[in-house]
Amino acid sequence: MLDARNVTAIVVTYNRLPLLKQCLAALRAQTVQGFTVLLVDNASTDGTADYIKTLAMPGLVCRNPGENLGGAGGFAYGIRAAVELGCEAVWIMDDDTLPEPDALAALLAADAAHGDGCGWLSSRALAPDGTDQPMNLQRKTMYRDIDGFDAAEVPAVMASFVSLFLRTEA
């Protein structure tokens, strides 16, 4: 099983400090610890850099590319930086993602069970009211019918930058 110490959570932010604070608190509350948090601050102007300097968060690495690369650009930048740090897997999320305390533990368990047979893993994304968010909700495809699939793990054909987990060897 992949050890959490070999995982880097990548969080991309731009001028959303209140959301970032909640995201970082949720990462600190994970039941599995020891992973690195790589924060990509896309040149925020809302006090994010000053706030980060005040944090005493073990495993936090902050990178600022000096410009707003956008979401996808920030994730590409973060993945390259995480690979340079030597991690074996990345856990990608926007700054408004609030992972449940057992989210990383569940992803690590799913990776141990299916890691060789899947390209990536993704968490279920819920709105604040508990309803499913459409960005990670799986749909029928011509390749697979998932009607009635009621399990903790669902075959997936798409995901968003809301709790996307993949091995760096991919």
Whereabouts are the PLM-identified features?
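Short, acidic, metal-binding catalytic loop of nucleotide-sugar glycosyltransferases
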Residues: 25-34
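Short beta-strand-to-loop acidic/aromatic patch adjacent to the donor-nucleotide binding site
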Residues: 87-96
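A recurrent flexible, glycine/aromatic-enriched loop bordering the glycosyltransferase active site
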Residues: 146-166
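Conserved donor nucleotide-binding strand/loop of the catalytic core
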Residues: 53-73, 81, 85
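Short beta-strand/loop segment that forms part of the nucleotide-sugar
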Residues: 35-43, 63-65
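A conserved acidic beta->alpha catalytic loop
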Residues: 26, 41-50
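Cell-envelope/extracellular polymer assembly enzymes that use nucleotide-activated donors
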Residues: 6-8, 36
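Conserved donor NDP-sugar-binding/catalytic core segment of glycosyltransferases
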Residues: 102-134
